[in-house]
C-alpha cells in the first residue's frame, strides 16, 4: 500500500480519479490488522500430472511418489478451499528480521479475517519425469512452461504442468490470494541440476538463470535445500560438522550463482542439524531454518527462526486427515483415491 500511495502522490498525475484511489487505499491500509497467530507452512513436490503413468498397479500398496506427491487435479481442488478459508500467500522472508542482531517476528498486516500461508516446493530438479514434468523453462515465446511427457509418449509444453503454472493461473483469477504478488519458495538442491538442466554446462547455467528470473517475476523466491540431499552422511544420524560445511559451501558455489543468494534454508528430510554443524549454515547467511513436522512450529532463537512445514501428499492425506481438515482443506473433497494404490 505504501508503494502505491507513493506512486499516486506524484503531482504530475493528480486528478479526481487518482485522489479517489488514494482515499480508497488509505482506508484499506487503516483497516489492516496485525496477524499474531501461528504462521502455517505447507509444501509440495512436483505435481503428478498423469497418475496413470506412475500408478500402473493400483492394488499393491506403494510409498514413494504415492506418499510424498500430490496430483495436479488434487492441487487444483485445494486452492479454492485455501482461498475460502482466508489464506493469503505470504513471503517467508517477510515474517522475520533481525533487530539489533536478534531475530524477531515482523508485523504481518493483513485485512481482517485473513491469515498468511507460506507455500514451498521441494527439489524441482526433474531428474526422472515419468508422469510429471521433465523441465521448467522459458519457451521461445518468453512464457514459463513445463515440458511433460504425456501417456502417448509425446513431450508437450504445459503452462500448468506443475505447482507454478497452476498457482499463477489461480492468482490471476483471485489476486487477493497473494500478498504483494508473492507465490511461494522453491527449495533447490544441486546434485541433480535445477529445473531439469545441468549446473555443469554453460548452456544449462544460462537456462537456469532464465528460468529463475521468470519465476522471480511471477512472485517466487528461492531457498537452499542442501546440495547433496543426502540422509546417509549429511542430513541424518551420521551427520557431522565437516560434511555440513562441505554441503553448505557446495550449494553456495554451485547453485547460488545462478539463482541468487538467499537466507532461507529448507532442510532435506526436515532434518534439524545440531551444533556445531548448524553454525556453518548460520554463518553462511541462512537465518530462517525450516523442518518437516505434522505440528505447526514457529520458534525464535537469537540468530535464526525455526519453522516447521507440513508435507501435502498421499501420506498426509491418508494418515493426517484431521490436521489437514482442520487447517487447510477437506481431504475427502480433494484426495483422489481412485487414481492411486493404497498409501504406505
Please describe what each predicted stretch is.
Residues 31-92, 104-119, 128-131, 217, ...:
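C-terminal active-site subregion of NodB/CE4 polysaccharide deacetylases
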Residues 185-187, 223, 289-290:
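Structural detector of well-ordered beta-strand residues that form the stable sheet scaffold
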Residues 212, 216-230:
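Aromatic- and acid-rich polysaccharide-binding/catalytic face
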Residues 1-29:
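Beta-rich interaction/scaffold domains
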Residues 93-100, 187-190, 226-228, 266-271, ...:
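Short, solvent-exposed turn/loop segments enriched in Gly/Ser/Thr/Pro and often Arg
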Amino acid at each position: 500500500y505504501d508503494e502505491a500511495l507513493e506512486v499516486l502522490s506524484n503531482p504530475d498525475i493528480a486528478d479526481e480519479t487518482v485522489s479517489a484511489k488514494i482515499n480508497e487505499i488509505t482506508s484499506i491500509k487503516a483497516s489492516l490488522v496485525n496477524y499474531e497467530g501461528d504462521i502455517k507452512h505447507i509444501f509440495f513436490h512436483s505435481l503428478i500430472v498423469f497418475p496413470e503413468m506412475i500408478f500402473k498397479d493400483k492394488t499393491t500398496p506403494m510409498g514413494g511418489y504415492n506418499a510424498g506427491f500430490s496430483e495436479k487435479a488434487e492441487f487444483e481442488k485445494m486452492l479454492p478451499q485455501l482461498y475460502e478459508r482466508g489464506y493469503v500467500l505470504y513471503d517467508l522472508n517477510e515474517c522475520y528480521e533481525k533487530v539489533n542482531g536478534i531475530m524477531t517476528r515482523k508485523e504481518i498486516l493483513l485485512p481482517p479475517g485473513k491469515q498468511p500461508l507460506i507455500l514451498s516446493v521441494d527439489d524441482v530438479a526433474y531428474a526422472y519425469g515419468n508422469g510429471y514434468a521433465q523441465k521448467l523453462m522459458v519457451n521461445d515465446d518468453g512464457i514459463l512452461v513445463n515440458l511433460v511427457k504425456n501417456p502417448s509418449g509425446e513431450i508437450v509444453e504445459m503452462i500448468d504442468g506443475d505447482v507454478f503454472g497452476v498457482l499463477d493461473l489461480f492468482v490471476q483469477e483471485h489476486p487477493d490470494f497473494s500478498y504483494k504478488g508473492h507465490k511461494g519458495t522453491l527449495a533447490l538442491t544441486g546434485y541433480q541440476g535445477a529445473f531439469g538442466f545441468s549446473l555443469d554446462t554453460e548452456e544449462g547455467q544460462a537456462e537456469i538463470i532464465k528460468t529463475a528470473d521468470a519465476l522471480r517475476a511471477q512472485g517466487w523466491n528461492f531457498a537452499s535445500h542442501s546440495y547433496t540431499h543426502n540422509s546417509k552422511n549429511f542430513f541424518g544420524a551420521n551427520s557431522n560438522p565437516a560434511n555440513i560445511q562441505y554441503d553448505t559451501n557446495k550449494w553456495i558455489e554451485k547453485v547460488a550463482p545462478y539463482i541468487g543468494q538467499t537466507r532461507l534454508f529448507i532442510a532435506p528430510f526436515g532434518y534439524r542439524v545440531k551444533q556445531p554443524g548448524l553454525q556453518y549454515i548460520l554463518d553462511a547467511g541462512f537465518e530462517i531454518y525450516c523442518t518437516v513436522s505434522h505440528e505447526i512450529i514457529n520458534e525464535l532463537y537469537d540468530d535464526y527462526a525455526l519453522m516447521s512445514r507440513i508435507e501435502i501428499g498421499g501420506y498426509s492425506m491418508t494418515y493426517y486427515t484431521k490436521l489437514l481438515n482442520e487447517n487447510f482443506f477437506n481431504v475427502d473433497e480433494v484426495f483422489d483415491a481412485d487414481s492411486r494404490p493404497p498409501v504406505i
